[in-house]
């Protein structure tokens, strides 16, 4: 996952530091999200805190660092990760 996003925040495209990086659940766990690769992206801990239980796309589109290109990369990650690890054999 970190390589997919070039060791950068999935939302801001800023290089992540070890001290401030975390994993955001695209669909929050308390909103019926699951702890699987296709539901997770790397981001800054402060962005994860700000997003909280909000819808990812709704929250992200309101941020000053919003990028349609990054949003598409997030959706491409979801599709790739689900194809690789999510399908039952």
What annotation goes with each model-predicted range?
Residues 38-39, 46-89:
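A detector for short metal-coordination/catalytic motifs
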Residues 1-6, 33-36:
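Short, flexible, mixed-charge glycine/proline-rich loop motifs
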């Amino acid at each position: 996952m970190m390589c997919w996003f070039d060791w950068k925040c999935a939302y801001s495209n800023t290089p992540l530091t070890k001290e401030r990086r975390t994993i955001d659940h695209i669909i929050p766990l308390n909103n019926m999200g699951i702890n699987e690769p296709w539901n997770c992206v790397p981001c800054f801990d402060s962005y994860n805190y700000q997003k909280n239980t909000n819808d990812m796309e709704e929250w992200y589109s309101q941020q000053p660092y919003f990028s349609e290109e990054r949003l598409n990369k997030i959706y491409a990650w979801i599709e790739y990760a689900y194809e690789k690890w999510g399908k039952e054999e």
